[in-house]
């Protein structure tokens, strides 16, 4: 209730685009585009799975789609408010929390469908447990350093390497390429995010724009993996 009351104190004047730095406006618009694509993509995946009467696919794609859409929604809201505003600090926390959810949400279809056994379930439990721990950590420590956040995201993203053989076996060479390509681009994005904190504001802003573009490319890569390959299992 307290958080709801805080949010009610803000009006549309807080979203005056003249107060938003150019890079923040770019980040908002680019990830608003991500919201639209995520909703369309989720609808396609769920519709295909429903028509094929694949209940497991429907569930895991809903989880994946929700996590992807949530990330772009939180990122858009975070970047649209002026720097220094209280509501921006609130959405900064939500923005980081949504990254943990996206990582776990992307793992869900891959592990549940490509590794449908005990080992796949174990990986899922580990990743979702780390996501929950990460969420709790972000709630308690809002201003944790960028290098720490980026490092945790990268480590979570590559836990899948422990089950790389069955996944490689399940996917074709091209399917495996999109999995790895997306992971590498996400990783590069994480590194860019970490390094951007070490430069002056002007360079930082430009690197942050690059970071946002890389996130869109990586999520598009993994969506193609879901649509073209995983949905056909």
From Swiss-Prot:
UniProt-recorded name of the protein: UPF0073 membrane protein BB_0117
Transmembrane spans: 28-48, 58-78, 96-116, 121-141, 144-164, 175-195, 210-230
Intracellular or extracellular location(s): Cell inner membrane
Classification via PANTHER family: ADIPOR/PROGESTIN RECEPTOR-RELATED, LD03007P
Pfam families given in the database record: HlyIII (PF03006)
Record-level GO cellular component terms: plasma membrane
Family per similarity comment: Belongs to the UPF0073 (Hly-III) family.
Chief place of localization: membrane
Keyword Transmembrane: yes
GO molecular function ontology, one term from the record: pore-forming activity
Lineage: Bacteria, Pseudomonadati, Spirochaetota, Spirochaetia, Spirochaetales
Topology term for the membrane: Multi-pass membrane protein
Keywords for this protein: Cell inner membrane, Cell membrane, Membrane, Transmembrane, Transmembrane helix
Superkingdom of the source species: Bacteria
InterPro entries found in the cross-reference section: AdipoR/HlyIII-related, Hy-lIII
């Amino acid at each position: 209730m307290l958080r709801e009351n805080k949010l009610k104190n803000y009006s549309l004047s807080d979203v005056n685009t003249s107060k938003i730095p150019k890079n923040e406006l770019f980040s908002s618009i680019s990830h608003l585009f991500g919201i639209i694509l995520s909703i369309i993509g989720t609808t396609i995946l769920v519709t295909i799975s429903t028509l094929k009467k694949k209940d497991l696919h429907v569930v895991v794609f809903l989880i994946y789609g929700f996590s992807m859409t949530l990330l772009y929604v939180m990122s858009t809201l975070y970047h649209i408010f002026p720097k220094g505003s209280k509501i921006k600090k609130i959405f900064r926390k939500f923005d980081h929390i949504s990254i943990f959810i996206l990582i776990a949400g992307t793992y869900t279809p891959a592990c549940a469908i490509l590794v449908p056994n005990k080992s796949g379930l174990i990986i899922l439990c580990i990743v979702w447990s780390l996501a929950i721990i990460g969420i709790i950590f972000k709630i308690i420590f809002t201003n944790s350093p960028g290098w720490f956040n980026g490092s945790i995201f990268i480590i979570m993203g590559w836990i899948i390497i422990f089950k790389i053989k069955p996944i490689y076996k399940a996917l074709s060479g091209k399917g495996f390429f999109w999995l790895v390509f997306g992971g590498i681009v996400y990783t590069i994005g994480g590194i860019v995010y970490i390094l951007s904190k070490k430069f002056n504001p002007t360079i930082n802003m430009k690197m942050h724009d690059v970071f946002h573009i890389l996130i869109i490319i990586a999520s598009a890569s993994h969506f193609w993996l879901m649509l073209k390959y995983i949905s056909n299992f």
